[in-house]
């Protein structure tokens, strides 16, 4: 009897973990798709937006190059 209950508890915990992981993956997939869609739509305008925002906020992209 105890073995059957422990087996049932293990199966329920696995299904709950799988269910929560599935919900997490669904939310993550939806978020990534939204960001990829946004990136695709802004592929032309992003450099202009970046330049305007960096000028407004006085932020510069700094690249450090070392030549040995």
Curated annotation (Swiss-Prot):
It comes from Mus musculus (Mouse). The gene is Smim10l3. This is Small integral membrane protein 10-like protein 3. Expressed specifically in salivary glands (at protein level). It holds the Pfam family DUF4560. Signal peptide: none annotated.
């Amino acid at each position: 009897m105890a073995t059957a209950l422990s087996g049932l508890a293990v199966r329920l915990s696995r299904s709950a973990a799988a269910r929560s992981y599935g919900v997490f993956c669904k939310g993550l997939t939806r978020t990534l798709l939204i960001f990829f869609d946004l990136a695709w739509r802004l592929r032309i305008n992003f450099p202009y937006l970046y330049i305007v925002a960096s000028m407004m906020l006085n932020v510069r992209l700094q690249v450090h190059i070392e030549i040995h």
